[in-house]
Amino acid sequence: MDYGIAIPSYIDAWKDVQAAEKAGFTHAWFFDSQLIYSDVWATMALAAQNTNRIKLGTLVAIPSNRIVPVTAAAAATINKLAPGRVIVGIGTGYTGRNTMGLPALKMKEFKTYVSQLKGLLDGKDVLFQEGDKERWIKLIHSKENSGRDDFYNIEDPIPVMVAANGPKGQEIVGEISDGWITTGRSLNVPEGIPKIMESAKRSGNSFDRFGGNATKPYVTVLTSSCVLREGEAVSSERVLRNVGPTLVPGVHAMWESSFGPGSNLGISNSSIAEDYDKYIKEYGDKKNPSTPPDRRYLDVHEGHYAYLKEGEEKFVSNDLIARTLTGTPIEISEKLDYLESIGVNNVALSVVDSRSAQELIKDFGEKIISERTGL
């Protein structure tokens, strides 16, 4: 099992990534949401410059945030700083688009973008379209093409992983990606892996960039964790602070499905959505009574994966916390055993800020990683 820390990109995260590397974490994942976090590539660049072994990945980059040659150049540049340690996780967009009042990207556009990105990172010529114009593009100053190696690095492979929960997304994972990113909220790994493997078989795709079994995708599950201290309850203030903000985004998605502009996320619960709509109206009106109703989504996504808004804790239940890797060291280890048994290769553990990162790094590193790896 690989162990990752997942960070809502704050620019000084390199300090926590450095500590995570020392504690035995194998991966650091960075969120890409331009209106609520620091720039993901700038944050990764600092982490790359200040670490030696830990792998660095986006979780996940959003196609509409940057045209494909910009994303390719960014990833290849980080790969120059951290050769062979870069992974591009990519998805159709949740907060990266919902914070702009937009739904997730359509699958046809998404597939085209992923295919072009992989082509560019593999040093190929790619047909790029802007409006009604189609033009061939490539990373011109790669070492192989120009002899220069001071701009970026595509000689060391950069795996591209696709985030997907539904069947159409899983089809794309199998057809063109190097691995699969999903969430621990609705654990669909046992059903998803066979579908992805079948899609890969039909298209002739291989997952060999991660080594091991080339026919099975490398699977990363995004979740969160808090190692309970002796006598501590899952409902403690510390657990709520560290884990709660990673759970309410699911409620935000339910609100979007019923009331917001990002209605194609596929996460719906009308009852919870109605309760949250009532809450967010009261919260927004208290904060700024003059906020127009058509900007309500801006209040919804405040605090996303970073903190709980006042009153938002009522949407974090013990049942939701139980779905995360929160518990005693023995309980967490048992959950990891189960995840490993169903084909999960990497757990990406969300933190909300540097304080929660340092707590997780210390507790999970000492009581889980060290015990399981013997290091």
Residues covered by each model-derived region:
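Active-site mouth loops of central-metabolism enzymes
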Residues: 1-11, 61-68, 155-165, 225-228, ...
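N-terminal beta1-alpha1-beta2 module of alpha/beta enzyme domains
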Residues: 1-59, 158
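Hydrophobic faces of well-ordered beta-strands that scaffold small-molecule active sites
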Residues: 3-7, 28-30, 55-59, 86-90, ...
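Acidic-and-aromatic substrate-binding clefts and catalytic sites of carbohydrate-active enzymes
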Residues: 7-12, 32-39, 63-69, 187-191, ...
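Short, acidic/polar
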Residues: 9-20, 74, 164-172, 328-338
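Acidic (Asp/Glu)-rich catalytic clusters
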Residues: 18-22, 44-55, 75-86, 174, ...
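Alpha-helix-loop-beta-strand connector modules within alpha/beta enzyme cores
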Residues: 41-58, 113, 120, 364-375
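An alpha-helical appendage that flanks or caps ligand/catalytic pockets
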Residues: 103, 107-150, 191-338
